[in-house]
């Protein structure tokens, strides 16, 4: 029997880390109403906590990319998971809103920022020369699995017991299970296990060697491809983690849907999110990532149209299925394009900039709809704003050139 390559252990452990850490982050919406009642604060204030969290997360991403280059992805992922666990556990002791800003807005967010796809993506690149799109898909499926398990799980624990017991359970999951698994099982490079990456050593060395280029980082900012990846990914953050992960549960309750229906919708969304992530990763190995992204953003806009008219449970569930299929499915194609367009740059640094853009979008997507809700008493205007932004993101991906053409042009410039 052929022995399982350790690369699959690596991607499985990163899946577990993202499931737990990002699942904690994605569960924020479950705590919105309990915290409103507990601390007598309005929706916009709760949204501001989420916004601060996204800003801290986002600002940390380029720094995390540098830390991964310096200390290795294993250390960054493991200790970040521990920081997230300790911070969410300590929210049990919170007695006023400023403490939530400190523990969740700062502590949890720094931990989540470290245990993100910046460090995890570096592991995938180091361990996979081939089947990289599939590996990215499996890794990113951790987001969907965390959403499917921890968000409805948090909802039910809050419903049956209390939000304080829920944060204790989430904290112990990270401290007792995830942190030891990351520390004991992750390895930064195949050489640490006396093996080669999937696809061969030569290809991996070419991809992961220290990046040297005549172009400055400022030159990267002047590249059209940089901004045409960054801005749609900002819109991605606005419409997924910002808008839906913060406001979908309150929206559902405002429309009179029960906790059972809301949990079913969240679970369906997360389940189809996993399917969409895996499918997009597989397709990204075989087809144009640029065209995939164009389709994904357009379908996401269509799903929000359905949500606007979701006055019956079956429409809410239909939205959940369609939105789930395209939720985090944008990540693998975006990362594939980034590694193809910017081959001369640090992988961790480039993914860090993408993640920063995503978190800026997430921060705006959490706060702006909260303000709109406070002013108008509904989310309709926020949904129409999101639809317009998604159409723009789809068009911007149409306007991108294929990576092969960009690489040929860059090579021609170097030859001259």
Swiss-Prot record:
Q: How does it sit in the membrane?
A: Multi-pass membrane protein
Q: Which InterPro entries match?
A: MFS, MFS_dom, MFS_trans_sf, Proton-linked_MCT
One term of GO molecular function: transmembrane transporter activity
| Pfam families cross-referenced by the UniProt entry | MFS_1
Domain of life the protein comes from: Bacteria
Any one GO CC term of this protein is:
plasma membrane
Q: Which UniProt keywords apply?
A: Cell membrane, Membrane, Transmembrane, Transmembrane helix, Transport
Localisation per UniProt entry: Cell membrane
* Residues passing through the membrane, by range: 4-24, 45-65, 75-95, 100-120, 141-161, 165-185, 226-246, 264-284, 304-324, 347-367, 380-400
Q: Which family does it belong to?
A: Belongs to the major facilitator superfamily.
What is the name listed in the Swiss-Prot or TrEMBL entry for this protein? Uncharacterized MFS-type transporter YbfB
Gene that this sequence comes from: ybfB
